Amino acid sequence: MKIATIKTGLASLAMLPGLVMAAPAVADKADNAFMMICTALVLFMTIPGIALFYGGLIRGKNVLSMLTQVTVTFALVCILWVVYGYSLAFGEGNNFFGNINWLMLKNIELTAVMGSIYQYIHVAFQGSFACITVGLIVGALAERIRFSAVLIFVVVWLTLSYIPIAHMVWGGGLLASHGALDFAGGTVVHINAAIAGLVGAYLIGKRVGFGKEAFKPHNLPMVFTGTAILYIGWFGFNAGSAGTANEIAALAFVNTVVATAAAILGWIFGEWALRGKPSLLGACSGAIAGLVGVTPACGYIGVGGALIIGVVAGLAGLWGVTMLKRLLRVDDPCDVFGVHGVCGIVGCIMTGIFAASSLGGVGFAEGVTMGHQLLVQLESIAITIVWSGVVAFIGYKLADLTVGLRVPEEQEREGLDVNSHGENAYNA
């Protein structure tokens, strides 16, 4: 799809969904309803979407620990977001942080609007993104991290990594000023979370028996259910990042459908060739790979670009969870880096290509060439990787020094459900 009327679009769209529009401050009821629905969909991605997806991927003796970690970190992020997160991410400030004018949402009038939606809805929508990002990380730490360590890490990482990167990309900070394109969270959400997960997986070490015992998903129907919820919720994630129910939201919606379908096929046929059989897990993983890959691009590219990004993301994700994972020698139980990191990087780079009007996209900002845009995209990826990696290292080390990162070996063997939470998912 080609939208020829948006020549100035990318200069401003690069700051979506954190953009404060310059249009008259008039709330539109339809846009507000649309954004509230999108916010609810993104919240639904975390609870229960990502919890069920990850819960099914791990062993049955640890499934409740995963559901608990996702649920409690979700609650923690919600509180931190309204206390200071939103203000530091989207308040006016410097290249890295906003200000403190909106602490506890102070100074935000009930009737304050951003573009055509009430600012309170913007607070909730952006908070839902912070929640899902933190939820993604815990999959890399599954089956051996101490519950209290997760909470300490989340406070540090949300404050010093998620918030500044969100400000840099969507809040008018450094990367926004450079013209980085990230429509719905390729850098802010997926690469950011994947790097934090990878660092954590290295620091916490491999699970007891890793490489010697067969660690298989204990409940594939649960994985499928989680995938379906994530898929539906992702339409709120991507289309909602337009900030209004307009033609860009429609474009993002269609591109999400196309890229997901293409990635499922890409992953499945790749797996079929590699292993001799297509699997349900492969189809679910392919869907997530396509959704991740199209996230930074969905509002900038045409349908042809979405198709290509989907296929490439599907194959790249398959490579990420097989060959790259073996190369890295890391125990990432839910393949957070292999899917979200690899496909997030692929999507961000390809956004700089397929946003070109000659390739069906909405076109670059005036005077910007594809080569320049690709350099900016690479810059945004590099900054996100380094920033998130350093902050994650600090966060994990702080948690380790205070409460210890990992549960004792005997507790790990017995399972975190019983030892950390005093419950069993499957009682005889």
UniProtKB/Swiss-Prot annotation:
Impact noted for substituting residue 241 to A: 4-fold increase in transport activity with methylammonium as substrate. Shows 80% inhibition by thallium
Effect of residue 415 to A/D/E/N/R: Almost loss of activity
A single GO cellular-component term on record: plasma membrane
UniProt membrane topology term: Multi-pass membrane protein
Topology Periplasmic: residue spans: 23-32, 91-119, 172-185, 242-248, 301-302, 356-370
Biological processes annotated in GO: ammonium transmembrane transport; carbon dioxide transport
SUPFAM superfamilies, per database record: Ammonium transporter
Binding-site list for NH4(+): 241
GO MF entries: ammonium channel activity; identical protein binding
Chief localization: membrane
Effect of residue 234 to F: Retains 80% of transport activity with methylammonium as substrate
Cytoplasmic side: 55-65, 143-146, 202-221, 274-279, 322-333, 400-428
Stretches that traverse the bilayer: 33-54, 66-90, 120-142, 147-171, 186-201, 222-241, 249-273, 280-300, 303-321, 334-355, 371-399
Family label: Belongs to the ammonia transporter channel (TC 1.A.11.2) family.
Domain notes: The C-terminal cytoplasmic domain plays a significant role in normal function and it might also mediate co-operativity between the three subunits. The C-terminal cytoplasmic domain is also required for interaction with the T-loop of GlnK.
Protein name: Ammonium transporter AmtB
Gene, per the UniProt record: amtB
